[in-house]
Amino acid sequence: MFPCTDGLKYKGYLFPPINFLEGIQTTYPRMVSQKKYTKLGSLKDYQDLLERLKKIPSMISQIIDLLKQGMREGVTYPRESLNGVDDQFEKLQGDVEDSPFYVRFRDMPGSLGRHVVSRIKTEAFNITENEILPAFRRLQEFIKYEYSSALRSPPGVSSIPDGAEFYQATLSWHLGTDLSPQEVKLDIKHPLFYLLTSSFTHRFKILASRRWKPSRKKQKLLSRRWDSI
């Protein structure tokens, strides 16, 4: 077994979620706005969601602090990881009425109580307009005007301090084995491929079973960007 705490020394926390696949600018709006991720039925459900939304600006401030620390220590994202991220942030800056952070409150049923619904809707609108969207704008501009200058050109993690050790630790965590990267070949015909993908999230299992075909060249697989994820 490999406890999570064993990996703290490799400072993976200096890669907070801002990349084009799993950024706070995409996962949180989707989680809040889509009913399949956040089910709202009772008044308490809406109140709880509102309390969670209030914490987003603080979370974004923490992300900026971690990115700044990463810049100081030479642990930053590769340039490719942030392709299209600015556009993702920009999509959030629109009419508050249609904001993914507000739409669930906009559509609150009056049956929950006219006065309390009005109060919660007003509070959610104000928080979205005055706190959440400005916080996302602040992170967007920090990435665009400051962090982007520190992005590393080599995409491999070996280009960061102790990167080879970081890679080995990540491999050991996902595979549950001490095999070196040289010993593990990511071949879709190899049983270890399925062991590796099974330790990732569900979407990677789907990609492995439906979209990674044996006829595809490995280099093409590694360089391809899955915009549909």
Predicted regions and their residues:
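N-terminal maturation segment of proteins
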Residues: M1-I229
